[in-house]
Amino acid sequence: MPFSPLGKGFLTGTIDDKTTFEPTDFRNVVPRFTEENRKANVAFVEWLKTFAARKNATPAQIARAWLLAQKPWIVPIPGTTKRHRLDENLGAANIQLTAADLREIDRAASQIEVHGARYPEALLKMVDR
C-alpha cells in the first residue's frame, strides 16, 4: 500500500516554491518541502502537468494511474475531505496508461534529481524498520 501516493500533495500540481503552509503543517519540517527544494523539484511536476493535459487528466490522476499500473496488488488509498477530490481520485481508475506512457513517465522521472530528504533526519531513522 503506497504511503502518500501524491507526495504529500506535491504531485497534485498545486504546490510550488511560493506555496506557504499553515504553521502546524508537517511539510514545514520536511526537507523536500523547503522553498529552495520545491523550486528545484517543481520541474517534474511541470512535466507531469503537460503529460496529464495530453491525457485529459490531472497530475494527481496520472500519479495514481501510474501506481495502479505498477502491480495488480499495489492499491493507493487516497484520503480526502473534499467531494471534488474524491471524484478526481476515482477518475484515476479510468485512465489507461500504455506501455509507452509508462516508459515516458519513468524516463522523465529518472532525468530529474529530487532535492531534499523525504523526512527530517530523526524520522528517517525510523523508515524501513
Q: Could you say what each language-model-derived stretch is?
A:
Residues 23-54, 69-73, 87-129:
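Terminal-tail/helix-coil boundary detector
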Residues 1-23, 58:
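Aromatic-lined glycan-binding groove of carbohydrate-active enzymes
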Residues 1-2, 76-79:
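Hydrophobic faces of well-ordered beta-strands that scaffold small-molecule active sites
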